[in-house]
């Protein structure tokens, strides 16, 4: 029975070996909660099947590449020349700039479903705001993105991420202004902030599909691909290539809860200078290497 279930998951559902293992663990837990001792759900034959399926997954899966400034420029040009409506063009670009400079996981920004959402985890209109203030005597603008359910275990009370203007092509604050201008209204505080013109939520899946449709004109996705996580990985990779120490890279990307605590201890003025200098240095590094 277990072998038939595993075979169905592989041949019909097309799920990975890791996902099948999670399903088997969940199945075992259901039995235990109902007071039943489950039989061995991973006999030697199942283990062999899963190992073989894992090897196939590894061989067939195209490697995911880290985003770079050069590819961001290409994405911008492709969006400009695409057949998308102007609002969608600017929405995709805004999400790209935020994911890139804020090192966000894509579902920290986007909903998982087009027609439904969980208000306790999804980024709503009330969870992102533009702040104008003086920092070191200079008028500045930045976005505060409130994550209600961050991945880091010890930060379940929610965290505020500040994303500053960079003065570069990929400036997230400028992208925010341009999106609002074409949208002609502020996001509904009680609904997902990033919704398309038809009212449907932009999802991580639809965002990846749009990325592939655009970048796939120049990149063979059968051999390597850019997906939503490429933005988060890209900033870290470029920081490493530019010589930034591991501690700053970890802090910028909130790679674990201790890194975020270090982020919080850094003053706002210091974070602004650090993010802006970082963006300009990496953009310059990209121009020199291209």
Label each residue range with its predicted role.
Residues 1-290:
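Extended, non-catalytic subsegments within catalytic or DNA/protein-binding/adaptor domains
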């Amino acid at each position: 029975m277990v072998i038939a279930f595993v075979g169905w998951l592989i041949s019909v559902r097309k799920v990975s070996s890791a996902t099948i293992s999670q399903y088997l663990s969940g199945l075992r837990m259901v039995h235990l909660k109902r007071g039943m001792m489950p039989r061995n759900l991973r006999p030697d034959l199942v283990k062999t099947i899963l190992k073989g399926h894992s090897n196939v997954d590894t061989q067939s899966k195209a490697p995911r590449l880290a985003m770079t400034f050069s590819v961001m420029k290409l994405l911008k040009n492709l969006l400009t020349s695409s057949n998308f409506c102007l609002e969608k063009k600017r929405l995709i670009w805004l999400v790209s700039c935020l994911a890139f400079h804020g090192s966000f996981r894509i579902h920290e920004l986007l909903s998982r479903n087009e027609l439904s959402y969980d208000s306790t985890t999804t980024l709503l209109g009330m969870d992102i705001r533009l702040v104008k203030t003086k920092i070191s005597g200079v008028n500045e603008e930045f976005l505060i993105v409130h994550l209600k359910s961050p991945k880091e275990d010890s930060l379940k009370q929610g965290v505020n991420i500040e994303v500053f203007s960079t003065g570069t092509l990929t400036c997230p604050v400028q992208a925010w202004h341009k999106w609002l201008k074409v949208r002609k209204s502020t996001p509904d505080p009680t609904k997902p902030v990033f919704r398309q013109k038809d009212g449907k939520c932009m999802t991580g899946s639809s965002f990846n599909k749009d990325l592939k449709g655009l970048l796939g004109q120049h990149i063979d996705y059968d051999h390597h691909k850019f997906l939503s996580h490429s933005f988060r990985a890209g900033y870290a990779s470029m920081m490493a290539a530019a010589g930034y120490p591991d501690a700053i890279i970890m802090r910028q990307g909130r790679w674990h809860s201790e890194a975020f605590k270090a982020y919080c201890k850094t003053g706002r003025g210091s974070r602004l200078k650090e993010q802006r200098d970082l963006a300009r240095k990496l953009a310059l590094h990209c121009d020199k290497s291209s």
